[in-house]
UniProtKB/Swiss-Prot annotation:
Example of a GO cellular component annotation carried by this entry: actin cytoskeleton
GO BP terms in the entry: negative regulation of DNA-templated transcription; regulation of DNA-templated transcription; regulation of smoothened signaling pathway
Compartment(s) of residence: Cytoplasm, Cytoskeleton; Cytoplasm; Nucleus; Cytoplasmic vesicle, Secretory vesicle, Acrosome
Name this protein carries in UniProt: Actin-related protein T1
UniProt KW keywords: Cytoplasm, Cytoplasmic vesicle, Cytoskeleton, Nucleus, Transcription, Transcription regulation
Superkingdom in the source lineage: Eukaryota
Transcription among keywords: yes
Stored PANTHER family: ACTIN
CDD domains, alphabetized: ASKHA_NBD_actin_Arp-T1-3
Biological role stated in the UniProt entry: Negatively regulates the Hedgehog (SHH) signaling. Binds to the promoter of the SHH signaling mediator, GLI1, and inhibits its expression.
Family: Belongs to the actin family.
Protein's organism: Rattus norvegicus (Rat)
SMART domains: ACTIN
GO molecular function, one term: chromatin binding
Length: 376
């Protein structure tokens, strides 16, 4: 029998991403822990006290020991591809980061748009069979982000490490047929910046360290407002970046060039729509009755939307693409890298959410397929 009292315990909120996993407790403002979505397996015996307690390492710990580890990334382009490592990552987050017992608290977990049925059911099986959670809910990442903005209807432009997507949402439910995806996101921008730096002759060994290039990207890269502004943007953004080894990089046109791939993915040889046209394309696939509402509530989500100038550039291009006179509003929360997690924290704090849980009793009676019936 299900101990219903456990459903009253604060839920554990997971936001699983290709680059980062965020975890915390329902009702809190931001995640307690944010770790890199990486699991490291020793190449040989590592003389470490910590190696006695576990045979793998996760997050920053794994990255710091990368010379002696085989690094695995369990989530690729938003989808789980290595289930054994994903289970290890969840176990570490439960036990070592949060210090909670999985069988004592319900679990709310975000999932990518258009998540395959097999992935949803596998997640459900692991949570109930391996971790014995009392209840589970899988929520579309974009729905969580919109909830964090206190809205139930709108369009979410979400861009993280592995994928960028536009998701129209009506009264709390995503509209799958109108979702548009672009496989250009944070990691692609980092890789593009690395290539540009190498082409300029920066061959310092440490420059190949992804963390260093990520830091350059996050601190110095911007989005220009268009080709006419590019030269001014390059001049304005001329800057130096000091590498860990003491050398410096003179940054100039890289700053405006790199995030441009979100608007013109052709720069990477990818012949898909850029984010401005993606927004319009998704909205135009929806019923005409709600299109104006969607244009009036566009929400940015994910760390890759944090580039200075991105919101202004997007608005400028949408004003050209949309019908003349269409009211357009873009919401860009300063905490939008945590939007989906925050939305989950808000949703699970509502007294009405209790009826939404897929309980252990539901799983026992109907199997993993029950997640298709209760989480949509």
């Amino acid at each position: 029998m299900l101990n219903t009292a456990r459903l009253d315990n604060p839920a554990v909120i997971f936001d699983n991403g290709s680059g980062l996993c965020k975890v915390g407790i329902s009702g809190e403002i931001v995640p307690r822990h944010v770790i890199n979505s990486v699991v490291g397996h020793p190449k040989f015996n590592i003389p470490s006290a910590r190696s006695n307690r576990k045979r793998y390492f996760v997050g920053e710990e794994a990255q710091c020991m990368y010379d002696g580890l085989y690094l695995h990334y369990p989530i690729e382009r938003g989808l789980v591809t290595r289930w054994d490592d994903m289970e290890k990552l969840w176990k570490d987050l439960f036990e070592w980061e949060l210090g909670v017992k999985p069988n004592e608290q319900p679990v709310f977990m975000t999932e990518p748009s258009l998540n395959p049925r097999e992935t949803r059911e596998k997640t459900t099986e692991i949570m109930f069979e391996k971790f014995n959670v009392p209840a589970l809910y899988l929520c579309n990442h974009a729905v969580g982000a919109l909830c964090a903005s206190a809205c139930i209807t709108g369009l979410v432009l979400d861009s993280g490490d592995g994928v960028t997507c536009t998701v129209p949402i009506y009264e709390g439910y995503s509209l799958p047929r109108a979702i548009t995806k672009l496989y250009v996101a944070g990691r692609d921008i980092t890789e593009h910046l690395t290539r540009l730096l190498l082409a300029k002759g920066y061959t310092f060994p440490c420059i190949l360290n992804k963390a260093v290039v990520d830091d350059i990207k996050e601190k110095l890269c911007t989005v220009s407002w268009g080709s006419k502004d590019s030269e001014k943007c390059y001049q304005r953004s001329l800057s130096e970046y000091k590498l860990p080894d003491g050398n410096t990089i003179q940054m100039s046109d890289h700053l405006c060039q790199v995030p441009e791939v979100l608007f013109t993915p052709e720069h990477l040889g990818i012949h898909d729509l850029g984010i401005s046209k993606m927004v319009c394309n998704s909205i135009m696939k929806c019923d005409t009755d709600i299109q104006e509402n969607l244009f009036a509530e566009i929400v940015l989500s994910g760390g890759t939307t944090l580039f200075p100038g991105l919101q202004d550039r997007l608005l400028k291009e949408l004003e050209v693409l949309a019908f003349e006179g269409t009211p357009i509003k873009i919401t860009a929360s300063p905490d939008r890298c945590y939007s989906a997690w925050i939305g989950g924290s808000v949703m699970t704090s509502l007294t009405t959410f209790k009826q939404m849980w897929v309980t252990a009793e539901d799983f026992k009676e109907y199997g993993a397929f029950v997640v298709q019936r209760k989480c949509f």
